[in-house]
Structures are given as structure tokens and as C-alpha cells.
Amino acid sequence: MFSNYLLSLAIWIPIAAGVLVLATGKDSRAPLARVLAFMGALAGFLVTLPLFTGFDRLSGGYQFTEFHEWIPLLKINYALGVDGISVLFIILNAFITLLVVLAGWEVIQKRPAQYMAAFLIMSGLINGAFAAQDAILFYVFFEGMLIPLYLIIGVWGGPRRVYASVKLFLYTLMGSLLMLVAMVYLYYQTGSFSIVDFQNIKQIPLGVQQLLFAAFFLSFAVKVPMFPVHTWLPDAHVEAPTGGSMVLAAITLKLGAYGFLRFILPIMPDAARYFAPVIIVLSLIAVIYIGMVALVQTDMKKLVAYSSISHMGFVTLGMFLFVNGQLNDWALKGAIVQMISHGFVSAAMFMCIGVMYDRLHTRNIADYGGVVNVMPKFAAFMMLFGMANAGLPATSGFVGEFMVIMGAVKVNFWVGALAAMTLIYGASYTLWMYKRVIFGAIHNLHVAEMKDINCREFAILAILAVAVLGMGLYPQAFIEVVHQAANDLIAHVAQSKI
């Protein structure tokens, strides 16, 4: 019985839990709010596990589908479904949300109930965006999740939190207005807002495809974010609380890349081929130039934020590598796998920075040094996650990058060579930060007073370490889920609509 409503449960359990936590009200009831938030996040995660275990890896199309009329007059429906791509993102989102609730357990003292509730509600809305099969439903969830994210940064962020949250909101909202117009145009072509109907339009002139591409691309490129519309992300990360940075990097950025897979590539394949060289150049700029920018950062959060832009450039590169008019198999699957890996690794890196910030209240690299002498367990975890961020073999960070490089070399040797620069820059800025923060002599008396990670922090980092190593050592568990959906997308994009 419940299997018919798993996606609805994955959406509405976190939202309902968030409302319940919000109802606890005053800070004096913070212990109750934390327990309810944990139970809600745990229930939200557990309900996604049957999606993974029950997913038919050999079957194409959408599974766990639901359909209910919402606004019949406009043919807007509550339609849900997942394929091998979206199912992984829903599970990742629920997983990270659970860890974020634990990460803020003792740290957030100001309005903890509202803080936890914002994350739970945002988690449900993000799941809705990944599961939506109706364009307007997708738009509602896609834009709705901005509200709790705006509040998380604007209320619990750093000194410049208002500036960062407004910048985030304006960038992402303005980019989405044209997408709504494009959806209305597609509605008039199909007679419905069904995303599947959009994808199955037989004929769209190239000029129209290019206009639609521009409308959708602006919205999704800002969310990824791609160069040059990336400037909101470092500010948002620096000002966001630890949990906000974890979700922003691990989940929110993936919504933009997911939009490329769900809308741009299948609906506008000819325009995607036409603009692919431009996307490849912008992606390589993100990989190389933004990697160089990360090298000169003095703030740990800002360094990892630029690292995220560089890694997401790798993702968009993999999505737009065409060979003889067809998407490259290795590169596309590698891009999807890289997104899942980046979810684990980026969340872990921001958690590590948060652990140090909670003790020393600074993110300046120069204020640290010799941390390994007082926090050896923490230093070991940060080394693992740093190496995964650099793409070390046997970690999750290597798998997707290697697959994209394989696909890039098949398209053009020099594109592959330039893409491989991410491994060099990733190692450079990660080791540069690690050496100055973790190794060396203690020259700050406050560092000497730092305590090693507690049981709660150890549990969070250990869970993320298992995910990073598990995916690195046995990536097939993830690749086999993605395989059929990626093949279906490749076959669909190969058919011209001119």
C-alpha cells in the first residue's frame, strides 16, 4: 500500500515534521524541538530507502509514479515519478538533511526550532522538485525551496548574511522568470504541463529551441552555478551556518544540473548540440580559472565554495559532450555520479570547517596551524575528505571525474587534457589548506586549547567517510541505478526535432 505513495511520503513527511517542530515555539522547548526534528529527518530518510531497494535497475521510464488532478482547468496535476537519476538525488537529499539536523544539535542556540524546521521543510520541497512530473509542480517546488534557504542564511548567517541572502534570492529568482514563460509556451504546444509531454514534442524549429534553451539555461546555470553567474555562491557559503553550507553545496546546486537533464537536453536536443561548444568552454573556465581562484583564498569556506564551482563545471562539461551528434555515454554517466560524490564530499568538507569554527570562531587559514597535535581524529577525517575533494583513487571523488575525462578524451584530446587539470588544481588548493591548517607548529594559543571531535561530530564524519569510501570502492552500486536512465536520455537526445 505505502509503495504507491512513497514519493509523497518523501515530500510531505519532512514538511509535516518541520511544521510540527515549528509549533514547539520558544527556545525553552529546544530539547523537544531537536528530538522531533531528528525523528522527522530520520523518518524522511528511512522512507526513501525502499525507493533504492525497490527500484528496477533494468527498466526504463519512471517508477513509483503518482497522479492526481490539481488544477484541471489548466491541466496542472500533482504528478510524481522517479527514474535512475532523480531517485539518487532524493535519497542523497534525505541523507544530508539527517546529518544537518545532527550537525546543528548543540551549535544552534538562537531559535533552534525554527532553524531545524527550515531544513526539514526545504528537504521536502527539494524532494518535490526531483520527483515532479508536472512542469508547474516542479516550478513551485524549485522556487519554493528558496524561501527556507533564504531564511537559513538571512537569520542564522554571519555578519553580511542579509546581503548574501538577498543576492542569492535575486540571482536565482530572476533567472527563473523566463523559465516560467518557456513552460507556458510548451503548454500551448502540448496542451498540458506534463514534463513527459514536453519531452515527446516531435518538432520544434531550431530558432524556437534556441529561445527555449536560453530561457531554461539562465535559470539552471545560476543554480549550478556556472561561470560567469557564480558570484552569489561564495558569499552565500561564507555567511551561511554550517548546515546551510552543507545543504547548499550537496543538494541545492544539483537542482540546476538536474534541470539540464530533465528539460534542456530532452526537450531542446538540437539547441543543446548547437550551444554545446559554448557550454564546454564555460565549463572548462570553471574547472581551470575558478580552480586557480580557489588557490589564493585565505578563508576556508570561500576556498571550498570555489572548489564546488570548479567541480560543478566538471559536471556541466560531462553533460554537453557530443560525439557525432550523440551524448557521450561515459561523460554523461560520470557527470551524474560526480554530482552524488560531490554531495558527500562537499558536505563533509563544510562539516569539517564548521567543527573548527565552533571552537575558534574564525575561518581564516592563517589563524590555524598544528591542529593535528590537539585533534588527531579530526585531522584523519579531514585528510580523507580532502583527498576525496582532490579526486584520489579509491574515494568517491575519483569515479565521476575519471568517467568524464574518459568521455572528454573521446570527444577531443585537448578537452580531456584541460578537464584533467581539475585533478591538479584540486590537489593543490586542498593540500595547501590542509598543510597550513592541520600540520606545522601551534602558533595560536587558542588552537592549543581546542578539543578533539565529540561523539556527535565523530558519528557525522564517520557516516560521511563510509559514504565516500563506499562509493569510491564500489561505484557500481550507483552506476547501475543511473545506467538505464542515462541510456534512455542519450537515445532521446539523438533524435533531431527540427
PLM region spans:
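Alpha-helical multi-pass transmembrane bundles of energy-transducing inner-membrane proteins
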Residues: 27-32, 117-121, 125-208, 293-306, ...
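Predominantly late transmembrane helices and immediately cytosolic-facing juxtamembrane segments
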Residues: 227, 346-350, 416-449
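Structural signature of hydrophobic alpha-helical transmembrane segments
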Residues: 2-13, 82-93, 135-148, 209-222, ...
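Transmembrane helix-loop-helix hairpins at membrane boundaries of multipass inner-membrane proteins
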Residues: 1-6, 20-117, 192-200, 487-488
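C-terminal ends of transmembrane helices
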Residues: 19-27, 97-109, 151-160, 224-238, ...
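Alpha-helical transmembrane segments of multipass membrane proteins
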Residues: 18-23, 49, 98-102, 124-128, ...
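Central hydrophobic cores of alpha-helical transmembrane segments in multi-pass inner-membrane proteins
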Residues: 8-24, 38-51, 92-104, 122-124, ...
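Juxtamembrane/interfacial segments at transmembrane-helix boundaries in multi-pass membrane proteins
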Residues: 55-77, 176-231, 235, 260-278, ...
